[in-house]
Amino acid sequence: MLVIQSFRWDDKNYLELNSDIRKELRKNRVNADIRTFYLDCECYMAEEEEERMYNFIDTIRLWKPDLILVNDDQATYTLMKCGHPFVKKVPVVFSGVNFPNWDLLEKYPNVTGSWDKIDYKENLRLIDQQMGKSRIYINYDKTSLGQLAFRELIKAVDTSRYVLNYNQLAFQLNDPDFKVDSMTFRTEMRMKAIRPSKNVIHFMPFRKANGEFLLSNINGTYPYCVFFNIRYDYTSAGLSKMFVTPSFTAVREIFNINVEVLGGYFCSNRIQAAEQARLAAKILSGTPVSSVPIVESPKEYLYDWGEMQRLGISKEEVPTNVHIINMPISELGFLSPLPWA
């Protein structure tokens, strides 16, 4: 069995994900010789990336894996886009894909998987429930996946309860799509020290920001601010690590990798691996891929205990539907001393 991962081999997320994939395959009684290829997508332009994938697929034709497991948007898209004829000859199960390319998928009847549709609305509700009315900072970028994430987020926002603030895009990027007058901008700066009456979503061009702008917005100068990660790329972990204020995430990749992310509502590594292994086992047992429809991945609410400690959040302050990981045994609360201890 071939596993294709989108990012570098040393991506912190893969230590857990690769282990979970093996565990879940064993649970489904799939005893597989697993080989893993890391696309390292952040280091290549689109054409180079497709060529890299094509050349790699060329090397496995003689090995002929029974099935390919491919993870996340970049590797899934590039596997189909590279155009290697072998890709159409072997069953493929994708997982962790936030923005499926449906047009491309129609050309590959041998490809199925689980769609990790990001639930922005539920994550915003969680932030409001945990933090109260806040200024929610979101990294804005004009990459293809960045624009998809931006559009999906906008669709999910209830504008009767949230204010969408594009001011920094107008001033920092001189972006003609976003206009604001300087008086509005100055008023906003004066109001930053006051808790807003509505949640305010600030779209921040952190990729293009100068040092002064970046530092003034991440160092905790202004209260009632949180960082919300809406998708994953090479900037996500670094930004979350730099923010002094609480960080939430709508995707699994930067959770539980020691970059100071409190948590969120998303499809965890455990769920992703379980879904992928379940679909793989079904296909390997003889079910045609055409009879295995693409499904939407389940999600769960997760917080990291260590980050709760850093932020001074007690167990009693956490919503009851949130599962806390990395909690020491002494804090679990259900263990009582043995009668003979």
Each language-model region and where it sits:
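Short hydrophobic alpha-helices and adjacent helix-cap/hinge residues
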Residues: 2-341
